[in-house]
Amino acid sequence: LNRSLFLILPLLALLLMAGCMAEQPTAAPPPTIFLPATPLPTPTLPPLDSGWQTLEPGLELRILNVVDEQRLWQESVTVLRLDPAYFRFDVHYRPGKPLQLEAWQMETGALLVVNGGYYTEEYFATGLVISGTAPFGSSYAGFGGMFAVTAAGPEVRSLAAQPYDPAEPLQAALQSFPLLVRPGGELGFPDEDGQQARRTIVAQDRAGRIHFLIANRGAFTLHGLSSYLVASDLELDVALNLDGGPSSGLLLAGEGDGVVAG
């Protein structure tokens, strides 16, 4: 029997972040304290590549650390690679009623919980979501991509190359944007906007395996991430940006407290 793996959206974390941004009463500035100059310790550079670690049959973990020309640590990319033969994928969605990753995991018992998609201020999806075989919202047209669960299994597709057909019997789906790797492993985001942020990605490699990735330090622009994925040895056929900014996150349950990124 396949283990359950859910792509869950949206998150209460978005609401909590908004609450943290509320204005606070202005306090008197603290007194200035001058300390003697002491050289700061040089941060230890983590291994650039952990290699694939098998967590259980069909599930592998890899951590890739990115450095610049001066060998300074810029980004950490957590990659989970899943063989669809071992897992059941699904999308859960409560319009207007977001939950935290931990709450979704407790409610569903899923092995892996990942947030994704874009929403209005009232937490309604701006693109198409299919949850429990029921459609919500409207499909993007000509841009972005879709994570879909069909009778044959999960897939990541380009909506420009393969538009959504309301007649197709999808079990679950989530649309997002932009496409970072176009089908065939081609660069998906050629323009540089200069905006750095944390990112969550879903991808499918040439062997049909599903990858969930999170770039946790916020160093990548969309173009930079697109270029990185295309040049990597992950052999990705197509990759879709799921989320960006503080809400990016995934939760992998397991022994102890599990693995949380984001």
Q: What is each PLM-predicted segment?
A:
Residues 1-8:
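Bacterial N-terminal signal peptides that target proteins for export
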Residues 17-19:
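C-terminal motif of bacterial Sec signal peptides marking the signal peptidase cleavage site
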Residues 21-139:
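Zymogen propeptides
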Residues 79, 146, 201:
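Short, surface-exposed charged micro-motifs
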Residues 82-84, 148-154, 182-183, 204-208, ...:
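Short acidic-glycine loop/turn motifs at beta-strand connectors
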Residues 83, 114-118, 159, 215-216, ...:
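Active-site-proximal beta-strand/loop segments in catalytic clefts of secreted hydrolases
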Residues 114, 119-192:
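Active-site-adjacent helix-turn-beta-strand microarchitecture at beta-sheet edges
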Residues 123-141, 190-241, 247-262:
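Conserved, well-ordered active-site substructure
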